[in-house]
């Protein structure tokens, strides 16, 4: 069943056509999350032999955060989505930050202060953000692990490394 002997006929491929919201997207995400409205395709519509990607990318999570399935997306809204530099709630980055912030840093004043700084991060990677460097360096290994095949350190260790890097190279954690 997993060996392909040909192509699936076009008419048998699950399709999302003219969704209620009028908005279809693909951000290298699972195909059953392709619109911001209520009429997405369903996982059970796809045969397992199709070998679909089943994880969500941060881009697709952010698109779903930035749209509501009701409001019209004008040119400005589409450009804002295209150039968005944020991490989504529930993304890998968000989970790493949550793990770091759940740790008790009270025995290490420098790390406790850094954790307070990280807690103020709005998950945006804007160039003017005083929190983005610490946040980005804390989450980068977890996010890139599946591509680099380099095991990511535990969140607390990644955070320590980020703090050390910024202190060494910039003399501060908020360059």
Walk through the language-model features, giving the residues of each.
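Acidic, low-complexity N-terminal propeptides/linkers enriched in Ser/Thr/Asp/Gly that mediate export
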Residues: 2-4, 24, 72-175
